[in-house]
A protein has these predicted regions:
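Cell-wall polysaccharide-cleaving catalytic domain and substrate-binding groove, primarily
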Residues: 1-97, 101-156
């Protein structure tokens, strides 16, 4: 869902204050708290991705540097380091590659393989796949609709 139907190759972090409260209620419990990051993508990425997923603290800039890219939107220094090793690239090359059409596909294939998602796909465990990719089930109804449409299109 974050890739906007595979049309976006980088995570869109331009959120209003109200939307920040919905997406990250623990980090932004009210609109007053969210105002500082509203419509400031770099500041937001550095705040919400700080000190997790292998990223440094907020001042390191890692949140922005390692924001979601690719068709599955790999996120965080640790994921990019693993992707770089798999692609035999430097970390900087892997980050740049994930934002290209070819790299967006490469990163999705790598993520799918690294996280062993074929087994879940074979059993149509869409919620479990979603949790592996995004940590929750945001967009589940739309994802289920799109999967049904894809199955219909191939006559399955």
């Amino acid at each position: 869902m974050e890739s906007a139907g595979f049309r976006s190759l980088e995570e869109d972090l331009s959120y209003s204050a109200g939307r920040l409260c919905q997406v990250w209620p623990n980090r932004f419990p009210d609109t007053q708290t969210a105002e500082a990051c509203a419509l400031r993508p770099e500041m937001l990425a550095n705040r919400v991705y700080a000190s997790r997923m292998g990223n440094g603290d907020e001042a390191s800039g890692d949140g922005w540097r390692f924001r979601g890219r690719g068709l599955i939107q790999i996120t965080g220094r640790s994921a990019y380091e693993r992707f770089a090793r798999a692609m035999t690239m430097t970390l900087d090359q892997a980050v740049a590659h994930a934002a290209t059409r070819a790299g967006a596909a490469d990163s999705a294939v790598w993520f799918w393989s690294f996280n062993k998602l074929n087994g879940l796909a074979n059993t149509w465990s869409l919620d479990l796949i979603t949790r592996k990719i995004n940590g929750g089930t945001t967009g589940a109804a739309e994802r289920n609709r799109l999967c049904a449409a894809a199955l219909h299109a191939i006559g399955a």
